[in-house]
Regions:
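Catalytic-core regions of core metabolic enzymes
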Residues: 1-181
Length: 181
């Protein structure tokens, strides 16, 4: 039932966040809210409510999944906001996150019983069902093989080769290319 799970997009009003939020919605991902401090009360694309904090967004939607599209220097604050609000799966797109910030976020996630994918991940995709990240949909086809990779490009290439050979993917996960993830 992953297609029904709500996803919150942190940084939804930024250029990168808005571009990929639109693509995630077009793919079928259930984006239930966005978070950008100072932009609460607005709507993204006329339908997705924007909140000032993750706690407000989680209270309104009961979502357990979030994706972060903020610059690396704001990652730790965004991760803490998400994890302290009850998020259980956090997809961290920013690259070059300071190692100390990543370690602190991972420690908090462990304390909260949550998982962080990334930083510097292309995200997670269940082909033909949901996309939480920046992956292009073309290389992927639904099937039975799970693909995990530290490199986003290799993830796409492996999935494309499998697809072209007639083998689909059950899930694809980019674990993140930063030194610690």
């Amino acid at each position: 039932d992953y297609e029904k799970k709500g996803v919150i997009v942190q940084g939804i009003t930024g250029s990168y966040g808005s571009l990929h939020a639109k693509q995630m919605i077009a793919y079928g991902t259930n984006v239930v809210a966005g978070v950008t401090p100072g932009k609460g009360g607005q709507k993204f694309e006329g339908t997705v409510p924007i909140y000032n904090s993750m706690q407000e967004a989680v209270n309104a939607t009961n979502a357990k999944i979030s994706i972060i599209f903020v610059p690396a220097k704001f990652f730790l604050g965004a991760a803490k906001d998400a994890l302290n609000s009850g998020i259980k799966l956090l997809v961290a797109i920013p690259e070059h996150v300071p190692i100390r910030d990543t370690m602190e976020a991972l420690d908090l996630a462990k304390q909260k019983g949550a998982v962080i994918i990334g930083p510097n991940t292309p995200g997670i995709m269940i082909p033909e069902l949901i996309k939480i990240g920046i992956m292009p949909p073309m290389p992927f086809k639904a099937g039975k093989i799970a693909v995990l990779s530290k490199s986003g490009t290799l993830l796409y290439e492996i999935s494309d080769a499998l697809t072209n050979a007639g083998f689909g993917q059950s899930i694809t996960i980019g674990i993140g290319g930063d030194p610690v993830n």
